[in-house]
Amino acid sequence: MQAFRQRIRQTVPEMRRVKQIHFVGIGGAGMGGIAEVLLNEGYQVTGSDIAENAVTSRLISLGAKISFSHHAANIEGASVVVVSSAIKGDNIEVITAHEKRIPVIQRAQMLAEIMRFRHGIAIAGTHGKTTTTAMVAMIYAQAGLDPTFVNGGLVKSAGTNAYLGCSRYLIAEADESDASFLHLQPMVSVVTNIEPEHMETYHGDFEEMKQTYVNFLRNLPFYGLSVMCADDPVLMELSSQVGRQVVTYGFSDEADYRIEDYQQTGFQGHYTVVAPNGERIDVLLNVPGKHNALNATAALTVAKEEGIENEAILTALAEFQGAGRRFDQLGQFIRPNGKVMLVDDYGHHPTEVNVTIQAARQGWENKRIVMIFQPHRYSRTRDLFDDFVQVLSQVDVLIMLDVYAAGEQAIAGADSRSLCRSIRNLGKVDPILVSDHKQLAEIVDQVIQDGDLILAQGAGNVSKLSRELALAWGKE
């Protein structure tokens, strides 16, 4: 390990006067990934969170010291305190750090510091950035470039969401939710799409959000590269404002890297990418859906522009196992009413839910879709209510859980009962509201039929519930 760290230091100097780094909210995937990279670079890492999870367990195994409560004493010895966007200014550890004149910085500021002396590749966008980040990382690894990566979700092929490599490359998911991605100074920026989301950050103004993305892309040096999805009208509107080289990808005829002949069979997708020079590249993916073809083509575009050989690109994409909780097959199960397949998916925005439904329809056209949906946040349910009603009406059976509040107060008319009422009034599906999670297994067994595909959908604890179902059912 010492020799490895010496190799790193040839490229990336140590942060001056920083020995111990404390993370408040260390259990988040983005926070934990940065903490893991810094641990492996040789820094002392401490942290705090309200509960243990897989991220904290991994960090503890790597040598981090973590407290599962917030106390002033937790920051003892810290040179700097890193906070997640979920941590408020009245947190006792933040207050104590200010009193002791210890720098308090956002997660993205520390990520920017890790990126400072590296060739940074930042992947942003409303949807698809976690999967795209994972795909870029796997391509660069397959090409022998040994990249460092920090992702917001598990990279299944690597078994982790962060890794410290020896090369100059850093591949990172860029977070627009609090506009902190403006701290990053990458060499390559990818934007997958832009939709209204996290609008409280942008004062409810979509124009402000769009301008923030332009500012993010202008952080590139004049010789940097901006990679954009040509299928997204907002991105194409903004492309002329960036003032940097722009390369596009997508199904659009106008895309520089154009997707043709997409076909899906089950979990497999097949398609051809036509490169700017006319080269035709046949791609095989083992993750379903046109949205994943877009994610993969974004990654392919970055790699081709870097000069990576097709063999490494295509091998990495064919072997890509997905990102955590993205159309995650939990197994096939024999139930009293027949055999069913259970899939867990993180998508919690109407666009994300829609592409998951479309991937299921295209890959398993003869199966009924039974969705267990858990709305995430009252504010999102309120802001996107009509879109949720339309999208959720596409499934064959809808089991609706109560809104996962994520710390928010309830908002009148933005609850699951109101959603169910509006969906029922549309007349396409009759939702079943399940407020008591203990009843979920029984209700699922009542509604399923032989051959059904069950989608557990949402960003709250519906994933935990789906895994409890899988454990109770046992695989066939």
UniProtKB/Swiss-Prot annotation:
Entry's Gene Ontology BP terms: cell division; cell wall organization; peptidoglycan biosynthetic process; regulation of cell shape
Chain residues that bind ATP: 125-131
This protein's record includes keyword Lipid metabolism: no
Gene3D superfamilies per record: Mur ligase, C-terminal domain, Mur-like, catalytic domain, NAD(P)-binding Rossmann-like Domain
Keyword ATP-binding: yes
Reactions accelerated catalytically: UDP-N-acetyl-alpha-D-muramate + L-alanine + ATP = UDP-N-acetyl-alpha-D-muramoyl-L-alanine + ADP + phosphate + H(+)
PANTHER family (alphabetical): UDP-N-ACETYLMURAMATE--L-ALANINE LIGASE, UDP-N-ACETYLMURAMATE--L-ALANINE LIGASE-RELATED
Task performed by this protein: Cell wall formation.
Name of the featured protein: UDP-N-acetylmuramate--L-alanine ligase
Originating organism: Histophilus somni (strain 2336) (Haemophilus somnus)
Lineage of producing organism: Bacteria, Pseudomonadati, Pseudomonadota, Gammaproteobacteria, Pasteurellales
Underlying gene: murC
